[in-house]
Amino acid sequence: MISRHLQNNLMSVDPVSSQAMELSDVTLIEGVGNEVMVVAGVVVLTLALVLAWLSTYVADSSNSQLLGTIVSAGDTSVLHLGHVDQLVNQGTPEPTEHPHPSGGSDDKAEETSDSGGDTTGEPGARGDMEPSLEHLLDIQGLPKRQAGLESSRPEASLGLDDSTCLSPSPSLINVRLKFLNDTEELAVARPEDTVGTLKSKYFPGQESQMKLIYQGRLLQDPARTLSSLNITNNCVIHCHRSPPGAAVSGPSTSLTPTTEQSSLGVNVGSLMVPVFVVLLGVVWYFRINYRQFFTAPATVSLVGVTVFFSFLVFGMYGR
C-alpha cells in the first residue's frame, strides 16, 4: 500500500516538474542561450561607455588646445605691446641729472662703461624684437596703424579738420525723404525753395503722382516755401507715390469718389435691417402655419433671436 501511494505521488508531481523544466528551457532567441545574451549585452554596454569617454576626451583636448593657443596669442600680444611702450619711452628724452661734484673719476668711468654696455645691448635686443613687432602690427591690421598715424598728427591740424568738416553751410538744409518701404533719400535744399521746386528737383516728371506729408499734414500747395512750413535741417518728409491712373487733377474731383463711397456704404447698411426683418417674418409665418416642423429648442431659439434683434434695432434708431 505504501509503495502504491508513493507511485501515485510521483505521478502527480511529474507534470509540475516537467512544466518547470519547459519554462527553464525557454530562451530569448532560439538557438542562443540566455548566458550568451547577457555576456553580449555587457560587452556592448562596455563598448558604448568606452566610445563615449573617448569622444568626450577628444573634445576636451581640442578645447584645451584652442584655449592654449588663445592664451599664448594673448601673452605674445601683451609682450609685444610692452616692448612697443618701452621703445616709445626710450624715444622720449628724459631730464638729465648732473653728477654730484663730489663724485670721483672711478664712478664716472663705471657709469660710462654701464651706459656703453646698455647701448650695445639695446640694438641687439631691438633687432631681435623687430620681427615680432612687425608680426604684431600685421595681426592687428590697418586700424592700429591708422590710430598711430592719427595720434602722431598735431592737435592744431585735427582741430582745423574737424571745424571744416562739421561746419555746415548756413544757406542749405538736409531734408530726409522717407518712402513707404522704409527707404530714405537725402535731399539738399534751401529754406527759400518751394514744395514744387523740391518735387521737380528730386521727382522729375512725377510731380502730380508724388504726395509729400510733413508732421501728418499733406503739402498740397506747391508755392509754399520750406521755411514757411517750419521745415528745418534733418527734418523727415514722408513721400507717397500714387499709381499713374490715380493722379488727381483738383480737390473737387478728389472729393467726389469719397462721397460716392460713403453714400454706397449708407445704402448697404440701411438695407441690412429690412432684409433681416423680412427673414424673421418669413420664419415666424412658417412657425405659425407649420408648427409640426418646429421643435421646442427651435422655437426658443427663434424667440431669442427676435428679442435680441428688437433690442438692437431700438438701440440703433432710438437715439
Curated annotation (Swiss-Prot):
Assigned keywords, A-Z: Membrane, Transmembrane, Transmembrane helix
Gene Ontology CC annotation, any one: membrane
Organism from which the protein derives: Rattus norvegicus
Primary location recorded for the protein, binned into one broad class: membrane
SMART domains: UBQ
InterPro entries in alphabetical order: TMUB1/2 (IPR040352), Ubiquitin-like_dom (IPR000626), Ubiquitin-like_domsf (IPR029071)
Key word Transmembrane present: yes
Positions with biased composition (Basic and acidic residues): 95-111
Protein name in the entry: Transmembrane and ubiquitin-like domain-containing protein 2
Domain Ubiquitin-like: 173-246
Domain of life: Eukaryota
Membrane topology: Multi-pass membrane protein
Alphabetical list of Pfam families matching this protein: ubiquitin
Membrane-spanning segments: 36-56, 264-284, 293-313
